[in-house]
A protein has these predicted regions:
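Extended, small-residue-rich solenoid/repeat segments and analogous flexible loops
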Residues: 1-25, 194-207
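Glycine-rich hexapeptide-repeat left-handed beta-helix
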Residues: 3, 37, 45, 51-74, ...
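N-terminal beta-strand/beta-hairpin edge segment
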Residues: 16, 30-32
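Short, electropositive, low-hydrophobicity segments enriched in small/polar residues
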Residues: 22, 40, 137
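Conserved H-X4-D acyltransferase segment
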Residues: 28, 36
Length: 207
């Protein structure tokens, strides 16, 4: 069953199935689909999934011998319509809109994948680089203004998600129950999809 950290924000239209861990302050926006029914999906602290993101896994072991799971480190931004399959995304990465990251690929910390890019199976993207295209190719190293811009974008997206989810949930039974539990000192996520029994956890997931 999915495990959602108490401070995560999950949009009501998102679908979460199987062995999925969603860490604290993660934002999962409208129409996202996260499937951990073949292998696990781990989404760590403060990562943001924009609208229509699709995350899935393949059932087999990767060529590297590793389990074919999806792992997102802290503070990852997945823009609209991104698709991930059994890959690793490092801390502070940005994946541009409509991009595809294939199974076995690894995007290392602080890297940027341009929009409409395809990172092929088992491709390694080194730290702090910009890659783009189909297939994705090296463009340049990430510059300081780009890094600062991404930090500001993340802050803005997090605030927008919190306000939007609160606005649409204010009068729902799920939200009022959530508020009541918080007042009682119990932990709960702001919203959990009612289609699943979601276990709330208060521990960090280590790779």
């Amino acid at each position: 069953e999915p495990n959602v950290y108490a401070e995560a924000i999950v949009h009501p239209t998102a679908t979460i199935v199987g062995e999925v861990f969603i860490g604290p302050y993660v934002n999962v926006n409208a129409n996202c689909v996260i499937r951990g029914d073949m292998n696990e999906v781990v989404i760590n602290e403060s990562s943001i999934l924009m609208e229509n993101v699709s995350i899935g896994t393949v059932p087999s072991i990767l060529n590297s011998g590793e389990v074919a799971k999806v792992f997102l480190a802290k503070k990852v931004i997945l823009d609209n319509n991104v698709r991930l399959m059994s890959c690793y995304i490092g801390e502070d990465c940005f994946i541009g809109a409509n991009s595809v990251i294939c199974e076995g690929a690894k995007v290392d910390d602080g890297s940027i994948i341009g929009p409409y890019s395809v990172v092929p199976p088992n491709r390694y993207i080194p730290k702090g680089q910009v890659w783009s295209g189909n297939p994705a190719r090296y463009i340049k190293d990430v510059e300081k203004p780009e890094r600062v811009g991404l930090i500001e974008k993340m802050k803005e997206l997090q605030e927008n998600s919190k306000e939007y989810i609160k606005e649409i949930s204010d009068y729902s039974n799920a939200y009022m129950l959530s508020e009541e539990l918080v007042d009682q000192g119990k932990t709960t996520s702001l919203y959990c999809p009612q289609e699943f029994e979601v276990k709330i956890v208060n521990k960090k997931y280590e790779d």
